[in-house]
């Protein structure tokens, strides 16, 4: 059982009712495994890697004359040049080199026949193809220094799909279609038209009758008829048309009188033929019955009928019979003939109609092409539809049709597509055949005919059995394939153009890898699925990597996606989260995987279930895809079960094929693994989610991803138990790889010593500080263990941002009151207490990067310097000698961060300038100050500076100093690691010797140890490393060998460490890679502390968002009877209409947690002698409220030190976990309220902070988890005085980024019109907008203290006149004409 009080590095009371049997799978495993199977780095056998399959699908490449062959032998991947951190800082791509081994074979050809007769020459070569971006251990990619994520794509699975759609032409008529969708190649659509003719389209081109396709595939008319119609043999006897009596032909009411061959009535029209009657008729000798003439008149012949005398064709196959034709058959004495029975059950006349439709077009083609064979004509017809206007021969047309669907190079269904085809059509084609077969095409049309007659099943395209996931490995393989196809074409073209001797030809002369480079670069930089990683907090990062997008190449287009695709489908249950999706135009197109779901090898999402046998739940857990779960009866996770696993209630609510039904317990096949399995990670973090409206839950889960990491994060008092899972799988936290004892821990390193099957070891972990993330939040890790602590494998040893004791912590537990307060919380506004600001509760640190480049220009190079023209000394006092700001400087808007000068263009100097140059040297006057200045609305401390210099240019003092300090840090780290290796070596040797006995006497520190004794550990610890060899010689040969092996191993480890260190030092010495034209680049990192202020956006976890409207002094806030002031006041009207009642329950449980925490704090403060026993009793009492927890046994198993440590955490508030759909019940709430001494309605008496009077009503007060979102007022508000103007209209530009103004729009104009404020309105539309002359005059008048003159003509008016002139209209402005005349 996985349920435990432990959650991360703390205790949490979990109220789950059903024991958890399965660990939540790693949240990032989909991305990781997909990329690993694509590249298979570090594995000996890489033949099954995705990348190998791609290359093998392209090679070998032959030229047209068969002179050359290029074969692929295998690929190799190298090591990355820079590590992840370096790549990000330097703005490079974290990648590995890919090489392929290629063999070029030159063939000896027979001069006469041109056939190969032997090998002339063979050359092998290893070619560098390109750098492939490498996935980091946190499943992201670093592209050009920016961290990106490749989102998984949810697309239509290849295979066959049948649909019904409403006809565009005929009213209420349904049109049936069948589509064969490949992964690569031409789509095949089969569709009925309104006249019931069956057509086929290839790639949405013009439709042709389906029989044209069959004929192009080589089927004759008779073959096609036999495939689609039952053949009925009509016998002619006594001028009557007879057929064999078959009872199956008479289902339902009979439409005509059934007569025997003698003309006697057997069954009258309108009656039914029962099985008993049929049997009696057959036994009575009924063999032949009359075929009604009126039915025979409209039937068609099943094969060609020849004249018995002349042997000429009398009637073609599919000739429609009529009175004359039947008479002819009688006259010529035919005994029998065959007809196609299109009246049989599950059959229609669509194929016959298609033959009729194609007859006309083939007749015309016959005349133009002068070819008689109809099959050849059909192939030409398809060629002409696909490539209109091109001349064609019959051989080329046949070859074209064949290649379209049956050539593996052009057409690929993939293994998935083949599996879906076999499943749907009931064919048994081997799964390695990934092209179409003739059988596939025939069976698809046969099934479509069945669907039309109501005997087949229509597919649901939104069913998860028809949609699959393409993860990074497959997406990358597709991109690589696209690039290789281009390369293959280029190689073939090159081979064709080669002439003369080919002896000197090498593989690299043919292969040009530019095509691959461009496709992969494009995919990672501008592809729709490669996205800038959302790194606001660990949750946003984890959910971004679990995202499923229906958009992207080969996916949907959001403008055309309808409601059905976006909607929640029953098969999403346990596979895709029904809650977490963006609001707006992408709603439902971007989804997230559910918590427990996995993706199988074929790309289908699977959900886990426990098997149920005869109403008893077993412990067997299996994963099912949406297709596998069809027809099974599934019980929900909250079903009540007794201790033996038997379902208690005889009738339970179950799911079957997406329907909710009531069924008996014995008919249940499966049961949900957990009540959490329905939702995704973010939604599962919302406690009491089941009490929230879905719209608000959606907002809640989306807003948790926007919460900025706080300076002092605190895990929620009311959690769901999933907080530790997010922390476990987010890379931000450092987890122990192996269990052991913390040997050393400082601000930057943790060393853990332990033992495994190979003996003692010491693991090293690096702790990051003040790193800038993609979203400008600060990334810092805090050590969560101390020296001497014992840690388990996977335990969090350092918390990342937004983490607290190994749990996700995106906000703060604040005391909340639901009440109006002087109108300040109108419309969801939030009132805060000043206490939160004093205690830095909602303070966050943001790091911004500013960069400046020095370029090579025509008239000299730009330069970074302190020597700036026209700048006072005090303005640059914070810069160092190189002109770069010093680390630790507090900068404010307008301060110079990096001094830079740019040479002016060469202008002939005036005599004065020449004199100045003569006096002051070259510099004076011909450079402009182009320094990097701290932008408006940004102030903070400079935390880091990076300087990069191009090869061949001298590094300045600052760059040299940076390198020296980094070197010193690397040396220190290296020294530490060496010390730890020495320590590990001694531990392993001591380990070895403690288990062995001496084979001869040895003297140590004047003490003689006899043969057969063991030297004590404290003595061994004091033995000098160099004297150890002598001691070891007193042991057996095996021990001596083992000792030498240990020494050898550590010598290698130290050498490896030294190499690693040297490499890092070399990278430091390396010249930096900068883009062309750039000679130097400086990056300055500024850290800003943002306290919460009025205008910031805050939210709870239930979609209850609002803006801070007022920050009130602590003394003015309402307070409780014990004097505790409230932290946050929310509007009670925000709850009923939004229907997110979960927040009220959270507040109640939070209050209980805090009150119980206070009781534990009281025990600490009382300092009684037996306080540990008291703590144990109190904590056991609280933990025992949850049934599954077995609180007493757990508390008793803790030693005193551990108990006190956990109690100190609980003193700040007892932590609860209430799982979604399986949380706290009413009786548990009552028990907790009783323990915490809270009134049963959860309300408190409040006093007004200003007057001290008791409030009239009791108020709902408690603790809610509040988040501060990244919509910060400091980054939104700006004010423009004068600034840039738009070029054409001359109006001020818009937006903060461009320092723009606020548009005075149409509605604002109406407002001024309504008030009759004429002059204000005129000023708004002219002087303040686009009257160019007027605004200059107004500025001058204001500057000189004069009256503002009248406004002129707005620029927009001139633009309008110019546009009218462009339409050849002579437009002149009335005033101007008069002026010209005067």
Curated annotation (Swiss-Prot):
Keywords: DNA-directed RNA polymerase, Nucleotidyltransferase, Transcription, Transferase. The keyword Secreted does not apply. The keyword Cytoplasm does not apply. GO terms for cellular component: DNA-directed RNA polymerase complex. CDD domains: RNA_pol_B_RPB2. PROSITE patterns: RNA_POL_BETA (PS01166). DNA-dependent RNA polymerase catalyzes the transcription of DNA into RNA using the four ribonucleoside triphosphates as substrates. PANTHER family: DNA-DIRECTED RNA POLYMERASE I SUBUNIT 2. NCBIfam families: PRK00405.1, rpoB. This is DNA-directed RNA polymerase subunit beta. It comes from Aliarcobacter butzleri (strain RM4018) (Arcobacter butzleri).
């Amino acid at each position: 059982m996985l349920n435990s009080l432990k959650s991360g590095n703390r205790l949490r009371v979990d109220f789950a009712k059903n024991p958890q049997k399965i660990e939540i799978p790693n949240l990032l495993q989909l991305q990781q495994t997909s990329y690993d199977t694509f590249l298979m780095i570090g594995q000996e056998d890489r033949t099954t890697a995705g990348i190998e399959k791609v290359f093998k699908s392209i090679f070998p490449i032959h030229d047209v004359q068969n002179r050359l062959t290029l074969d692929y032998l295998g690929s190799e991947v190298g090591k990355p040049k820079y590590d992840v951190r370096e790549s990000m800082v330097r703005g490079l791509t974290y990648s590995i080199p890919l090489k392929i081994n290629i063999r070029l074979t030159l063939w000896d050809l027979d001069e006469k026949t041109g056939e190969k007769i032997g090998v002339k020459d063979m050359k092998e070569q290893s070619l560098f193809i390109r750098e492939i971006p490498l996935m980091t251990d946190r499943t992201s990619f670093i592209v050009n220094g920016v961290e990106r994520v490749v989102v998984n794509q949810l697309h239509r699975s290849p295979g066959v799909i049948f649909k019904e759609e409403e006809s565009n032409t005929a009213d209420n008529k349904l049109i049936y279609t069948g589509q064969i969708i490949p992964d690569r190649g031409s789509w095949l659509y089969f569709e009925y038209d309104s006249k019931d003719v069956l057509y086929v389209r290839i790639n949405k081109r013009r439709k042709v009758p389906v029989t044209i396709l069959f004929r192009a595939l080589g089927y004759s008319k008779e073959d096609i008829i036999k495939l689609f119609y039952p053949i009925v043999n009509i016998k002619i006897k006594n001028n009557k048309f007879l057929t064999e009596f078959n009872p199956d032909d008479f289902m339902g009411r009979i439409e005509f009188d059934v007569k025997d061959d003698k003309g006697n009535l057997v069954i009258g029209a309108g009656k039914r033929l029962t099985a008993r009657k049929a049997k009696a008729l057959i036994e009575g000798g009924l063999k032949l019955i009359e075929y009604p003439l009126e039915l025979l008149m409209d039937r068609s012949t099943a094969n060609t009928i020849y004249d018995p005398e002349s042997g000429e064709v009398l009637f073609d196959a599919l000739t429609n019979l009529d009175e004359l034709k039947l008479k002819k058959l009688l006259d010529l004495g035919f005994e029998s003939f065959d007809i196609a029975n299109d009246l049989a059950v599950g059959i229609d006349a669509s194929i016959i109609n298609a033959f009729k439709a194609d007859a006309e077009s083939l007749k015309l083609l016959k005349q133009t092409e002068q070819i008689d064979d109809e099959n050849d004509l059909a192939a030409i017809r398809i060629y002409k539809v696909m490539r209109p206007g091109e001349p064609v021969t019959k051989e080329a047309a046949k070859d074209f049709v064949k290649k379209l669907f049956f050539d593996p190079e052009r057409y690929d269904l993939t293994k998935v597509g083949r599996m879906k085809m076999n499943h749907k059509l009931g064919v048994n084609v081997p799964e390695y055949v990934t092209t179409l077969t003739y059988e596939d095409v025939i069976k698809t049309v046969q099934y479509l005919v069945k669907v039309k007659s109501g005997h087949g099943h229509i597919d649901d395209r939104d069913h998860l059995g028809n949609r699959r996931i393409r993860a990074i490995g497959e997406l990358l393989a597709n991109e690589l394939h696209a690039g290789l196809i281009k390369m293959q074409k280029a190689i073939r073209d090159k081979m064709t153009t080669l002439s003369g001797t080919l002896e000197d030809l090498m593989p690299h002369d043919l292969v040009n890898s530019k095509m691959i480079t461009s496709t992969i670069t494009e995919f990672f930089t501008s592809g729709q699925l490669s996205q800038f990683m959302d790194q606001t907090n660990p949750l946003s990062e984890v959910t971004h990597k679990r995202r499923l997008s229906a958009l992207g190449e080969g996916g949907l287009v959001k403008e055309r996606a309808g409601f059905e695709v976006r909607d929640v489908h029953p098969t999403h249950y346990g596979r895709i989260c029904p809650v977490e999706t963006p609001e707006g135009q992408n709603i439902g197109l971007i989804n997230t995987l559910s918590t427990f779901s996995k993706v199988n090898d074929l790309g289908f999402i699977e959900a886990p279930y426990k098997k149920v046998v005869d109403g008893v739940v077993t412990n067997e857990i299996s994963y099912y895809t949406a297709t596998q779960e069809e027809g099974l009866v599934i019980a929900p996770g909250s079903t009540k079960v007794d201790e033996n696993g038997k379902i208690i209630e005889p009738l339970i609510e179950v799911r079957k094929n997406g329907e909710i039904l009531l069924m008996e317990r014995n008919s249940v096949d499966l049961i949900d693994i957990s009540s959490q399995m329905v939702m995704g990670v973010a939604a599962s973090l919302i406690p009491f989610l089941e009490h929230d409206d879905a719209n608000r839950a959606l907002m809640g889960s989306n807003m948790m991803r926007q919460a900025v990491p706080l300076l002092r994060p605190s895990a929620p008092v009311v959690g769901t138990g999933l907080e530790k899972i997010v922390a476990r799988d987010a890379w931000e936290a450092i987890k122990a790889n192996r269990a052991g004892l913390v040997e050393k821990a400082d601000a930057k390193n943790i060393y853990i010593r332990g033992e495994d099957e190979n003996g003692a070891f010491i693991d090293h972990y690096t702790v990051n500080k003040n790193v800038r993330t993609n979203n400008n939040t600060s990334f810092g890790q805090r050590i969560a263990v101390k020296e001497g602590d014992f840690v388990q494998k996977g335990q969090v040893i350092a918390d990342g941002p937004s983490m607290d004791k190994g749990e996700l912590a995106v906000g703060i537990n604040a005391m909340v009151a639901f009440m109006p307060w002087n109108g300040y919380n109108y419309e969801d506004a939030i009132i805060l207490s000043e206490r939160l600001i004093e205690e830095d509760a909602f303070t966050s640190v943001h790091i911004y990067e500013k960069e400046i480049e020095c370029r090579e220009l025509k008239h000299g190079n730009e330069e970074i310097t302190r020597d700036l023209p026209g700048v006072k000394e005090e303005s640059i006092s914070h810069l160092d000698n190189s002109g770069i700001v010093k680390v630790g400087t507090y900068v404010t808007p307008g301060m110079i961060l990096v001094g830079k000068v740019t040479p002016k263009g060469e202008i002939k100097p005036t005599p004065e300038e020449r004199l100045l140059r003569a006096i002051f040297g070259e510099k004076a006057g011909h450079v402009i100050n182009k320094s990097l200045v701290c932008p408006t609305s940004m102030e903070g401390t400079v935390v880091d500076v990076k300087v990069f210099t191009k090869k061949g240019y001298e590094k300045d003092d600052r760059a040299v100093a940076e390198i020296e300090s980094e070197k010193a840090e690397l040396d220190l780290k290296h020294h530490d690691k060496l010390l730890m290796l020495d320590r590990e070596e001694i531990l392993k040797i001591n380990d070895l010797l403690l288990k062995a006995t001496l084979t001869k006497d040895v003297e140590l520190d004047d003490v003689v140890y006899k043969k057969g004794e063991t030297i004590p550990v404290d003595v061994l610890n004091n033995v000098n490393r160099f004297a150890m060899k002598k001691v070891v010689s007193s042991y057996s040969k095996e021990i001596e060998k083992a000792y030498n092996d240990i020494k050898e191993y550590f010598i290698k480890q130290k050498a490896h460490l030294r190499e690693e260190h040297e490499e890092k030092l070399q990278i430091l010495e390396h010249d930096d890679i900068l883009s062309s034209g750039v000679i130097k680049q400086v990056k300055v990192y500024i850290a800003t502390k943002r306290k919460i202020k009025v205008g910031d956006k805050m939210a709870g976890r239930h979609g209850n968002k609002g803006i801070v409207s007022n920050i009130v002094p602590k003394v003015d806030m309402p307070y409780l009877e014990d004097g505790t002031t409230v932290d946050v006041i929310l509007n009670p009207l925000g709850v009923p209409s939004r229907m997110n009642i979960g927040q009220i329950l959270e507040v109640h449980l939070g209050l209980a947690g805090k009150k119980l925490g206070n009781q534990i704090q009281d025990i600490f403060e009382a300092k009684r002698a037996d306080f540990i026993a008291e703590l144990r009793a109190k904590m056991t009492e609280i933990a025992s409220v949850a049934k599954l927890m077995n609180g007493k046994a757990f508390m008793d198993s803790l030693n005193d030190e551990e108990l006190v440590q956990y109690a100190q955490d609980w003193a700040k508030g007892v932590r609860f976990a209430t799982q979604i759909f399986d949380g706290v019940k009413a009786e548990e709430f009552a028990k907790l309220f009783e323990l915490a001494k809270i009134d049963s309605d959860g309300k408190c008496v409040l006093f007004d902070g200003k007057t001290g009077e008791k409030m009239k009503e009791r108020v709902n007060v408690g603790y809610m988890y509040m988040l501060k979102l990244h919509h910060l007022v400091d980054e939104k508000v700006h004010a423009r005085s004068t600034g840039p103007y738009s070029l054409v209209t001359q109006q001020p530009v818009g937006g903060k980024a461009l320092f723009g103004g606020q548009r005075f729009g149409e509605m604002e104009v109406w407002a001024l019109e309504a008030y009759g404020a004429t002059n204000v309105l005129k000023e708004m539309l002219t002087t303040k907008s686009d009257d160019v002359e007027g605004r200059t005059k107004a500025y001058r008048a204001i500057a000189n203290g004069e009256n503002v003159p009248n406004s002129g003509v707005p620029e927009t008016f001139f633009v309008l006149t110019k546009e009218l002139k462009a339409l050849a209209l002579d437009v002149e402005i009335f005033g101007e004409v008069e002026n010209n005349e005067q």
